[in-house]
C-alpha cells in the first residue's frame, strides 16, 4: 500500500485524545484546531511514550488513558499538509504525529460524553472505565457503564466497589453492591468516612 493510500485510510478514522484541565501536556499547550509540534518529530518505531510526538488513540484503546485528564478531544489528521508525519507507537495502542487537529471538546465528567462514547464503541469489556467512574464518584456514569457492559456478571465489579468505598462514594457503593460477590473471604463496611474490613472466619 502506498503511503498516500495509507494516510487516507488512517485519516478516515476517528481518533481521540484526553487532555487535562489546562490542556497542557509536558510543556505543550494544546489549542482548538491545528496543533504543530514545536520540536523534532520522533519517528523511531521502537520508542514509546517519548517526547517529539503528539499522541492520540482509537476508541477501543481510549479507556486506558482516562487518568490523563478530564476532557475528551476528537482528533483529525491533517494529511493534506505535505509536512504531516505520523507513526504507530510501539505499544500498539496509540499513535504519534508531528501535527494534529483538535475538534470538539467534551467533559468526561458529563454523562452525555459517555453516551457518545458508548455510541462510538468504547471498550467496556475491560473495567478501566468502571473503575475510573467509581473512584471519582460519578454515579450516573457508573450506572450507564453497567447498563452497557456485557460482562457485568456477579462479582465483576469488585475492584470498582472497593474503589468507591476507599474514596467514600456511598451512593456508588450502594449501587454496585448488587454486582459484588458477597461470598468472598472478607467484607467492606463504611464507618463514617473510614473503611473497615471484616475477615470471615
From Swiss-Prot:
It comes from the Viruses. SUPFAM superfamilies: Ankyrin repeat. The keyword Repeat applies. Keywords: ANK repeat, Repeat. ANK repeats lie at residues 125-154, 156-188. Disulfide bonds: none annotated. The keyword Glycoprotein does not apply. This is Putative ankyrin repeat protein R868. The lineage of its organism: Viruses, Varidnaviria, Bamfordvirae, Nucleocytoviricota, Megaviricetes.
Amino acid at each position: 500500500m502506498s503511503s498516500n493510500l495509507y494516510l487516507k485510510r488512517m485519516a478516515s478514522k476517528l481518533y481521540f485524545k484526553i487532555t487535562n484541565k489546562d490542556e497542557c501536556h509536558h510543556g505543550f499547550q494544546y489549542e482548538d484546531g491545528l496543533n504543530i509540534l514545536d520540536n523534532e518529530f520522533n519517528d523511531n518505531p521502537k520508542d514509546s511514550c517519548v517526547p517529539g510526538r503528539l499522541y492520540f488513540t482509537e476508541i477501543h484503546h481510549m479507556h486506558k488513558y482516562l487518568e490523563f485528564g478530564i476532557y475528551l478531544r476528537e482528533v483529525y489528521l491533517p494529511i493534506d499538509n505535505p509536512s504531516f508525519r505520523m507513526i504507530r507507537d510501539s505499544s500498539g495502542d496509540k499513535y504519534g504525529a508531528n501535527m494534529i487537529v483538535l475538534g470538539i471538546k467534551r467533559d468526561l465528567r458529563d454523562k452525555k460524553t459517555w453516551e457518545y462514547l458508548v455510541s462510538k464503541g468504547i471498550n467496556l469489556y475491560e473495567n478501566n472505565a468502571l473503575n475510573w467512574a467509581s473512584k471519582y464518584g460519578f454515579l450516573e456514569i457508573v450506572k450507564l457503564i453497567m447498563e452497557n457492559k456485557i460482562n457485568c456478571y456477579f462479582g465483576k465489579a469488585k475492584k470498582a466497589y472497593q474503589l468507591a468505598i476507599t474514596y467514600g462514594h456511598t451512593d456508588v457503593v450502594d449501587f454496585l453492591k448488587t454486582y459484588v460477590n458477597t461470598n468472598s473471604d472478607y467484607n467492606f463496611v463504611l464507618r463514617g468516612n473510614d473503611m473497615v474490613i471484616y475477615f470471615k472466619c
